């Protein structure tokens, strides 16, 4: 599927601010399941933009605006192709085994997904043993999260801990992803957080689909399939209906924007995403 994406992020400040510095991780990510064709980032007011690749392979832009401003807008425009039509099928060529050094970040506790006894207890209560390390085992874990947790807006924030989510069994896609990551790691499966977009419902007539935010899911590594995505929010294995933007240990590694400024001002954030199918 070929997709065009427009992501608008706008910060409004209650007073002039200066020396705004912001990391932007709005990709898109390029790998064997997704080919990046075009990407452009625009910043208002005009500032410097420097591109680099972070330690997880994410395309990252460092935006700096030195002059006084009361508004900062970042607009990214992307065109890409997603190619994984049958995500449940094992690849024709066996995946490259992960070296221990490649696994450590995605098996160890991370800032937003600590090692909680709740994860092991949930695995035991569901009857999971070693088979959770298989593709089918991870698929079942993803469905377990989907079935046991309620999708509910405005009950959590980006600061809500995974321990709180485990207690209340409700949240949004970020929370579902953190719970599934914790379960996978407790079962010995390398798992990482993915930020991106869902585009499976795009109309074929080039009409835009507008969303208010990005989406989140999990990629887990199994010996038969390599890295594959599992969307516990929607109870699906991730294929060409998802666009990957960034990966990391948890949300803290892939936050779309993160930065600072100098000045005594409150800020208000607004995000609009538009996606178009162009094939």
Predicted regions: what is each one?
Residues 27-29, 44, 77-79, 221, ...:
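Structured loops at beta-to-helix junctions and adjacent beta-edge loops in soluble globular domains
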Residues 9, 156, 233:
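Ser/Thr-centric signal marking residues that sit
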Residues 1-125, 131:
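Linear, non-domain "peripheral" regions
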Residues 143, 175-265:
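Hydrophobic/aromatic-rich core segments of domains that either
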Residues 13, 48, 94-95, 103, ...:
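Glycine-rich, flexible loop/turn motifs
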Residues 1, 7, 20-22, 39, ...:
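Structural beta-strand/beta-sheet cores of well-ordered domains, especially the beta-sheet scaffolds
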Residues 47-53, 65-67, 81-84, 114-123, ...:
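Noncatalytic linker/hinge segments flanking ATPase motor cores
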Residues 80, 89-91, 98-171, 179-181, ...:
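Secondary-structure boundary elements
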């Amino acid at each position: 599927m070929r997709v065009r994406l427009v992501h608008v992020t706008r910060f409004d400040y209650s007073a002039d601010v200066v020396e705004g510095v912001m990391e932007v991780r709005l990709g898109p990510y390029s790998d064997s399941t997704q080919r990046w064709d075009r990407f452009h980032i625009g910043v208002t007011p005009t500032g410097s933009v420097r591109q680099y690749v972070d330690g997880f392979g994410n395309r990252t832009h460092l935006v700096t605006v030195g002059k006084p401003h009361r508004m900062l807008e970042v607009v990214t425009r992307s065109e890409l192709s997603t190619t994984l039509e049958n995500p449940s099928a094992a690849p024709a060529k066996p995946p490259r085994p992960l070296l221990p050094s490649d696994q450590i970040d995605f098996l160890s506790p991370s800032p937003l997904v600590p090692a909680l006894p709740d994860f092991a207890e949930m695995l035991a209560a569901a009857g999971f043993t070693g088979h959770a390390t298989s593709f089918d085992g991870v698929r079942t874990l993803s469905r377990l999260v989907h079935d046991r947790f309620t999708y509910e807006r405005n009950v959590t924030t980006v600061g809500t801990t995974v321990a709180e989510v485990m207690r209340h069994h409700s949240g949004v896609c970020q929370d579902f992803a953190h719970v599934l990551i914790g379960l996978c790691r407790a079962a010995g499966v390398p798992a990482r957080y993915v930020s991106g977009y869902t585009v499976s419902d795009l109309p074929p007539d080039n009409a835009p689909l507008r969303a208010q935010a990005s989406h989140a899911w999990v990629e887990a590594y199994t010996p038969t399939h390599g890295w594959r995505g599992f969307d516990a929010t929607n109870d699906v294995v991730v294929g060409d209906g998802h666009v990957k933007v960034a990966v990391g240990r948890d949300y803290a590694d892939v936050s779309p924007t993160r930065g600072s400024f100098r000045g005594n001002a409150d800020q208000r954030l607004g995000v609009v995403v538009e996606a178009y199918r162009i094939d």
